[in-house]
């Protein structure tokens, strides 16, 4: 349900006929996307000196003309009139996304409205470079395409919703059910700092809809705008985010539901990856906003993967095999902070953070009784940063040699894990885990512009574990898929699964 705030009728188009305050202005030139059918004159004499966008009477502070594309007073127009000159994008987009998709429950597929201020004598209190462009594309299983766009400029707003085909009642309902999810995504992207709230969109009805795409370009007054690109369908989920602080991307392929484990296995794998990222962010000084957005997306996309219908699996796996896999869909992701050069006397010392993680799974064979599986996990961290000689001291690096007192750390970490599984004549014949972890820290100490220490701390771990005997102790029930979902309860399966999960430092646990 969308709540519409009260707005004075004097700033809205009058659909019953406009008096002297409203005229069609042939001399007014607007962008092609905002061609007026109604112009509302707002006299400066009728406004107060308030710095607020609207006076108590509903007029614009500073006077001006409100130009509307369509002469209607619908709830969306009311929201636009109330919000389009707000001081933040979060306020401007508040409730609009949900209201637009809610309309599909009312039989409406197309909507178009715009409003723009012309001739205002007082500038908006919002930053002059504030703008926002958001588009949502929804494809139905029948092939219909629904497009929605919201554009917010310094002195105007433009909204369009269009369907290229007639929608069924079921399709309308599925689209309307995305209202809260779409609004949550907008609220997250427009807040400062931004967040990725994609759970509602990722849970779209796959019986009626085939894909959902969300794109945004937003600027809350920063020098560099932020952008996000989200794609969701039944087999793939992907997001790319670009901020002034850096970029992150994640893609998850759910096209092979056979490798998805039990709920407990998936939860453990998600928690482990998040823990590894947190460790990398602390070790490499990663940007917290990008780290948080990656974790939100990773949790959401793998939650979506867990809800897929596993009845379409061509190659069911038994409990022993699932223990050798993470339980997650294959993925690839990265975080790259924008490099900085904080030391003017040594510009070659770059502060940076680059983290990547991935999982890939390959199958050979086409039956449950005879096949091999190889699953590879990889994680890499490259980072560099300056820090003070004493914790808590501010770094005040300048061209003055006396300011050159700091540590410069360069991190280069790499971790890999490979699981090899083989079934032959219905029996598990291979369950091998090969893992390695390398951590390298190169540290330079500078005192009054002189390098007083320069050393490297290397670290290397490697192991190969044969887990076949441990897994063969787990009983199977003889059903076609030989699975009783013991992955969350059997101690041997839990132990094996914990060993499988990729870590930047190998634990002392083994198969004993």
Predicted regions and their residues:
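Short, compositionally biased, intrinsically disordered N-terminal export/targeting signals
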Residues: 1-74, 78, 82, 141, ...
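N-terminal, intrinsically disordered, small/polar-rich Type III/flagellar export signal
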Residues: 90-216, 222
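Amphipathic, non-membrane alpha-helical segments that mediate helix-helix packing
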Residues: 69, 75, 82, 93, ...
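Long, low-complexity, repeat-rich, intrinsically disordered, solvent-exposed domains used
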Residues: 134-137, 149, 160, 202-262, ...
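A eukaryote-biased signal for long
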Residues: 229-512
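Alpha-helix boundary/N-cap detector
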Residues: 67, 84-91, 95, 166, ...
